[in-house]
Amino acid sequence: MFIESFKVESPNVKYTENEIHSVYDYETTEVVHENVNGAYQWIVKPKVVKYDFKTDTRVPKLGVMLVGWGGNNGSTLTAGVIANKEGISWATKDKVQQANYFGSLTQASSIRVGSFNGEEMYAPFKSLVPMVNPDDVVFGGWDISDMNLADAMGRAKVLDIDLQKQLRPYMENIVPLPGIYDPDFIAANQGSRANNVIKGTKKEQVDQIIKDMREFKEKNKVDKVVVLWTANTERYSNVIVGLNDTMENLMNSVDRDESEISPSTLYAIACVLEGIPFINGSPQNTFVPGLIDLAIKNNVLIGGDDFKSGQTKMKSVLVDFLVGAGIKPTSIVSYNHLGNNDGMNLSAPQTFRSKEISKSNVVDDMVASNGILFEPGEHPDHVVVIKYVPYVADSKRAMDEYTSEIFMGGKNTIVMHNTCEDSLLAAPIILDLVLLAEISTRIQFKSEKEGKFHSFHPVATKLSYLTKAPLVPPGTPVVNALSKQRAMLENILRACVGLAPENNMILEYK
């Protein structure tokens, strides 16, 4: 059975006019290596830590600024939100289609809340805590092309023509702000688009981005702003001692107009200085060590890297299944071809390398989890290929071959073909990222040993379900298994209303 909303009734939960207070027993285990009767043994010790959570239930008016607003993702997301807000329907060859938010974790997925008369009860994911309604989001942003959003939507060739015709009046007067352009960081073939750029030194560019964000917030009377990079993949930045390895060196490098500071890092610096969350939706190393230091010092949320939408999401599920089933993946070969501007930009070797790194590391934690299958240092052969084929446009093809060792030296091969409508998969992920980043800024917590409430760590690990290469704080394990990532996010929000993690034991029926 599905219910639209619910309220938790528990001595551990208190609802006030503006807040939800919850007391939560976090049950975990720690492993120690101890001398027991003269021999060292691994000892697993269960422990319980009591946490207090405090969630501000006042939902703000949210502004979202996209870097690369006029690209396929930005124009598709903007069009989709307008279509939902206006209740637009359109004719396809199959039926009359209604606007929806399918593909969004927050808007179109559900969570189990319990049972009623022997029937499982489910509720919308978004009903856990008060979230911003995507229909109410105000969009803005930057692009190195001055094409209006209606023409950008047409150029992208993602949405049906009937829908585009209905959306044009809403979008034809929307023009992105000038963006930061540095041809050294993206493919040369992007130069023809760059007619809408911010001039000046890197310090002047950062100052302009700050000015843009302040004016956007004031003009639209929004309470909060979240910025997300959905522009071209950049090449990797070189991390150099004295340049970008510390907060001080990074800021001094901006002042000196050092060439190795990328545009995405400049946007992120501007956001951190303004106290605005910044999310990187591309695979490059935007978050150099100095930028992470800056975010931690200023306690500003940063998240990334790279939207996890198609092939990589499937890979993080399938490899988790194989390793969890005691099957040993020995070879993973992933081939992609796509024809949109992302594919065109990735045709340059330096930008492809950023994507290759992002896609290749997705199985590492799952392999490391099973010392029965894999010796120390052993790893499956893993190859990623991406080719630009203009004809297929935004309809990316992903073909994967998984070869594994099974019982008694046998071999198993799984071949998968996945047609990924690139921007239609990415757009709802962008929506989830900004909505979850916003709600994260309204949650505070403390352990029983801490005196006062504090926010989550600025490096937003809980967004990892939505990213290929999750950004984590120093010393934190990287988790790529999709089921674990979703469970982490759901269980944190469940804790905010005093609900236990979903353990799927259903002992009441045993």
UniProtKB/Swiss-Prot annotation:
Its function, per the record, reads: Key enzyme in myo-inositol biosynthesis pathway that catalyzes the conversion of glucose 6-phosphate to 1-myo-inositol 1-phosphate in a NAD-dependent manner.
Protein name, per record: Inositol-3-phosphate synthase
Q: Which GO terms describe its biological process?
A: inositol biosynthetic process; phospholipid biosynthetic process
In short, the EC number is 5.5.1.4
| Cofactor requirements of the protein | NAD(+)
Family, per the entry? Answer: Belongs to the myo-inositol 1-phosphate synthase family.
Which pathway? Polyol metabolism; myo-inositol biosynthesis; myo-inositol from D-glucose 6-phosphate: step 1/2
Q: Which organism is it from?
A: Brassica napus (Rape)
Which compartment or compartments is the protein found in?
Answer: Cytoplasm, Cytosol; Nucleus
Entry GO terms, CC: cytosol; nucleus
- Tell me the superkingdom of the source: Eukaryota
Q: Which reaction does it catalyse?
A: D-glucose 6-phosphate = 1D-myo-inositol 3-phosphate
Keyword list (alphabetical) reads: Cytoplasm, Inositol biosynthesis, Isomerase, Lipid biosynthesis, Lipid metabolism, NAD, Nucleus, Phospholipid biosynthesis, Phospholipid metabolism
Where does this protein hold NAD(+)? Answer: 70-73, 143, 180, 190, 193, 230-233, 281-282, 306, 309, 340-342, 355, 393-394, 422-423
Q: Has the keyword Cell membrane been applied to this entry? A: no
